[in-house]
Amino acid sequence: MDWDDILARSASTGAAPDLIFREEVQKAVLACLSLQEFFSQAVLQGGTALRLFYGNPRFSEDLDFVRKEPGQPATLTAHTAQIGPFLERQFSFIDKAEAVIQKQTATLERISVRLRGTDPSANLRLNLELAAVPSRSNAPKILRYPPINPAVRVESPSEILADKVTALLFRPYLKGRDVWDLHYLLEEHKLTIDWIMVAQKAEDYGHQTADLDMRMGSASRRLAAEGPSALAQEMPRFLTPATLQQYAAVFPAMAAATARRITKFQQGRERGLGL
């Protein structure tokens, strides 16, 4: 792929060249890892999974992985040396690509992929993280990245929803991307929140679960109060102008609808319905 291909896709979709390029790098890294059988041990999660495999219109930033099974050994940093040369072969306009280990502990591995190109927009940093927690629901899927079209093991939408709810309950701040993804999964995919999986996720990440009901109430109120501004502040970075134009006016309604779903979930739990 050359830079003209990036510019042509940008012109046809309305997305900024740097967004198009980042997504192509994400695909290339996933292909590289798949060829090294990384997905026999690990699972893609988060916003990139929603974007590439479940039709979410928002672009994503980094690549996040978890282990395929509880207690199963998995390593991301072992593949560091292969990523840079693979990317240089995929993109003709890249002068240098390298992957650098930033963190390697028993609970988290992080790699920073750095690219430098002839065009300033081709200078990019992409973070990869592998958390030592298990996936609860996943399957292999084919990534559209010809001619390789690699198999990538991906969390199910229900598990991604559980991840997003867990983040909503325990993160000390609200991400606009999470509000968008929650609305997308709850309203567009019509999913229901799996309470058992949320509790499992909370425990996996070392959180106390005794106060989940209280946290759900707080999260619902925060969504309603802060969700519209979080969406307005963050989503212009991750949507095409045409998509943003359609959704910007309904950001308050999106946040309110998502807050109502969280409240309904909490009330159902209090009545023992296990929604």
Task: Cite the ranges covered by each PLM segment.
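Structured mid-to-C-terminal alpha-helical surface segments
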Residues: M1-A42, F53-N56, K68-L275
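Glycine-rich beta-strand-to-loop/alpha-helix junction loops that act as flexible
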Residues: Q45-T48
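Anion-coordinating catalytic cores for phosphoryl-, nucleotidyl-, and glycosidic chemistry
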Residues: S60
